[in-house]
Amino acid sequence: MTIEGNALKPDWSAPNRVRAISTTRAGGVSGRPWNSLNLGSHVEDDPEHVQENRRRLAESIRLDCDRIGWLNQVHGTEVVELTANNVGQTVKADASYTRHPGIACAVLTADCLPVVLADSEGTVVGAAHCGWRSLCGGVIENLVGAMAVPPETLQAWLGPAIGPERFEVGPEVREAFIKHDPEAAQAFNDDGARPGHFMADIYALATLRLNHLGVSVVTGGGLCTVQDSDLFFSYRRDGQTGRMATLVWLTS
């Protein structure tokens, strides 16, 4: 992926009419500890600052503010289709997709993994918020199913998330993934600082899920929101902090 201005853009082979970005923490108006491009309205930041940050984001990608489909994310597996009728409603879901040009699917993260999907014909795009619970619960599977195209025609981009050197989890997390798929064991090692804990690679876990579905083209990954405090918000590092946004949309 490449950095242009205050956003990351995927290095992938999606059709030209597909656009995707992931914001960094730079370029906004929020003060500490949300400095500065906080796009989350649920983190106790000044609502006017969040509104201005969202306006700046929309302007930078040449979309109207009310055409960005913000979600009420709950670490679940619900998927919503975004249309002109609901794009401004902040629907309770952890993934969205759309076939409508000029409407952006958006997910907010600050360590969780944003996963973007697009089909090879440029007819449908989607985005999922993958914390470990939603990822393990099947949010990617639900999104791929809802997009209703052959999975082998999809490609995925993995945005910035907590890296494998910083993502320490309890044994119940490892067990939950392995119960679903024994191959998931390869995404964990026993180097956790606390006894009985493991280090997890959320990029590898998501890639495994995608590959099993038939999505073989997966790009991105390799970043760590915890380690790169200049670029990224991190809940695990800072506690109260802002949120980045990852968006995907179709142009006309």
Language model: regions and residue ranges:
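Active-site microenvironment for binding and transforming phosphate-containing groups
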Residues: 1-252
